């Protein structure tokens, strides 16, 4: 007996479910919230991973468009106005967030065609 114990492998370093799935959003936290939220009696192992991926995709999409809106306005910081412009100018995001009011977002610039001044034809000589 050499006294080395059971010669098993060293315990592997813990790896989060988010990193296993290649996500930034917290899979463990979403799983906990799904369990505590009384949405269902049981929550499968894949559900929080899928939900985290969907939320991460939506956040990335909104931030991408808002960043473009900020750059168009020659600003380096995204403000609520940029989020509003990004969401309302995108057809699918606008449909998804149609019932959402963004504080300090303002409105989209829009002038009805009938209110615009009429173009007069100059007589050709």
Swiss-Prot record:
It is found in: Nucleus; Chromosome. The keyword Methyltransferase does not apply. The modification N5-methylglutamine is found at residue 104. Transmembrane segments: none annotated. One of its GO terms (cellular component) is nucleosome. Residues 1-21 are annotated as: Disordered. Keywords: Acetylation, Chromosome, DNA-binding, Methylation, Nucleosome core, Nucleus. The keyword Transferase does not apply. GO terms for molecular function: DNA binding; protein heterodimerization activity; structural constituent of chromatin. Residues 1-18 have a biased composition (Basic residues). It holds the Pfam family Histone. The modification N-acetylserine is found at residue 2. Belongs to the histone H2A family. Core component of nucleosome. Nucleosomes wrap and compact DNA into chromatin, limiting DNA accessibility to the cellular machineries which require DNA as a template. Histones thereby play a central role in transcription regulation, DNA repair, DNA replication and chromosomal stability. DNA accessibility is regulated via a complex set of post-translational modifications of histones, also called histone code, and nucleosome remodeling. The nucleosome is a histone octamer containing two molecules each of H2A, H2B, H3 and H4 assembled in one H3-H4 heterotetramer and two H2A-H2B heterodimers. The octamer wraps approximately 147 bp of DNA. This is Histone H2A.
């Amino acid at each position: 007996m050499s006294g080395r114990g059971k010669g098993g492998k060293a315990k592997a370093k813990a790896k989060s479910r988010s990193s296993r799935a290649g996500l930034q959003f917290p899979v463990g936290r979403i799983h906990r919230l799904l369990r505590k939220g009384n949405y269902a009696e049981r929550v499968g192992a894949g559900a929080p991973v899928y939900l985290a991926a969907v939320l991460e995709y939506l956040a990335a999409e909104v931030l991408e468009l808002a960043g473009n809106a900020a750059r168009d306005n020659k600003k380096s910081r995204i403000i609520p106005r940029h989020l509003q412009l990004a969401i309302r100018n995108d057809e699918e995001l606008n449909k998804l967030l149609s019932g959402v009011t963004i504080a300090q977002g303002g409105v989209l610039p829009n002038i009805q065609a009938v209110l615009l001044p009429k173009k007069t034809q100059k007589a050709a000589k």
